[in-house]
Amino acid sequence: MKIFKMLAVAVAMFCAVACGEKEGPSNTPTVGSFDAIENEWKLVSVDGVANDFSVYISFTDGLFFLYQQVYSWDYVLYEGEYTIEGGVLNGTYFDGGEWKTAYTGGVSEDGKYLTLKSKEATPVTYIYEACTIPEDIVNEVSRTRATEVVPFL
């Protein structure tokens, strides 16, 4: 009987530790502003859940370069311009299409994470981590129009 009690305590302790709050990118980082958005970013979670597709985005000098492997086997590149007005991020593709929504959020104070919260009826929170976009993705990407394949943004 004593063994069963010890086993029950061990299982309870394991469950308490295993169910504790996770650290890392799935939790929403402290959000600053978009002042430090000019960087390269990799999507790590959507509404706190790790994604099973690949999206990279680079922001530089008012331009964005979106590399995604979402609806295809290959990475697809979308390019365009972005603006930040009143703490809201918007983008337009070079072929004239607009992002599906605008975003609020910002870069974490330590510069490691970018949080984008969609301005939709049911907002979605996207967490990106600062990174360097792999050269093989940049060099082998297919360029496309925003109307040919559904872009992530």
Where do the language-model regions lie?
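Short beta-strand-centered aromatic/proline hotspots
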Residues: Y82
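Lipid interaction determinants
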Residues: G20-Y78, V88-L153
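Short, linear, compositionally biased motifs with a strong N-terminal bias
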Residues: A10-M13
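Positively charged n-region of N-terminal signal peptides that target proteins for export
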Residues: M1-M6, G20-E21
